[in-house]
């Protein structure tokens, strides 16, 4: 998965999930706002609400998402 794949899926309001280092991440549009809910299996009931640009700019393990996405497994969108 690439950052372009993620951006394209988000442009179509699609849910996206992937695993990185055994941790599941799930991103879905919030029905009540123009933000996205980002869930992590470490805190499954506590989503982070972010704009699309914030999601695309977020870091995982101190690495930009664009560097993490090519390393993920089980990517679905």
Regions found by a protein language model. Give the residues of each.
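Negatively charged, low-complexity tracts enriched in Asp/Glu with abundant Ser/Thr
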Residues: 1-17
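Acidic, low-complexity, intrinsically disordered interaction modules
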Residues: 29-55
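Mixed-charge, Lys/Arg-enriched low-complexity segments
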Residues: 48-77
């Amino acid at each position: 998965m690439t950052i372009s794949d993620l951006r394209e899926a988000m442009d179509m309001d699609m849910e996206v999930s992937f695993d990185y280092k055994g941790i599941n991440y799930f991103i879905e549009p919030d029905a009540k706002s123009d933000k996205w809910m980002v869930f992590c299996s470490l805190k499954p009931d506590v989503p982070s609400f972010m704009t699309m640009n914030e999601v695309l700019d977020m870091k995982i393990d101190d690495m930009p998402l664009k560097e993490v996405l090519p390393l993920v497994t089980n990517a679905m969108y």
